[in-house]
Amino acid sequence: MRKIKNMMMVGATEKHAGKTSFTTAVIKDLKKKYPETVIVALKITILWEGKHSVSGYRITNETDMGSVKDTGRMLTAGADKVLWLRCDEFNVEKGIEQLLSEMPENGVVICESNSARNYIEPGLFIMVRKSDEGTLKTTALSVMDFPHIEIRSSMNGHSVEYNPDIAEKILVEGNRFKVDF
C-alpha cells in the first residue's frame, strides 16, 4: 500500500451523498487560506469486470472550467490541476503509479475515491455519509474501517448540505493535512 501524507481522500457511502460538494468546499477554503499552495485534485474510478467495457487505464487532464462534471467543478473551485484516472480492476496499481508520477513534489492532493483507499493510505481519509442513508455502495463497505473523519450530509432539493465549518477546520501544515477540532 502506498502512503501519501500530502493527500486527503474523500469517499462516500452512496451516490449523491455530497462528496464533490464537500471536496469543492475544501478546495475553495484551502485556496483562500493558502493561496500559494499547489492543489491537485484527483478523481479515481475503478471499473469492475463485467460492468464496464474499459480495459487498462486512462488519465484525463480536466481543462474545461465550464464542465459540470465532478472534475470540472474541482477545477472551478480553484484546484491548480485536476486529473481523472479510470482503470479496470487489473490495472489499478499501474494507473495509480502513473497518476502519482504526475503529482508535484510540493503541494497537496485531494482525491475522490472509495476504492483507491484499498491501494493508497492518505494522510487524511474522510467519508461522507448521507443522513437519510440508503443502501451502502459496495466500494464504501470495503473501506468503512479506514476513515479518520465521517461527515454527515443531507439532501435539500437537488443540493447537498453539510456543516460548512468542517471544511474550514481542514488545515495544511508543511504540505500535510491536519484537522483542527
Where are these regions (language model features)?
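Glycine-rich phosphate-binding P-loop
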Residues: 9-26
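General beta-strand structural signal in soluble alpha/beta enzymes
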Residues: 9-10, 41, 83-86, 109-112, ...
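N-terminal phosphate/diphosphate-binding loop that engages ATP/GTP or pyrophosphate donors
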Residues: 26-87
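Short, high-confidence coil segments that cap the C-terminus of an alpha-helix
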Residues: 5, 36-37, 79, 104-107
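Conserved catalytic-core segment of NTP-binding enzymes
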Residues: 101, 105-108, 113-181
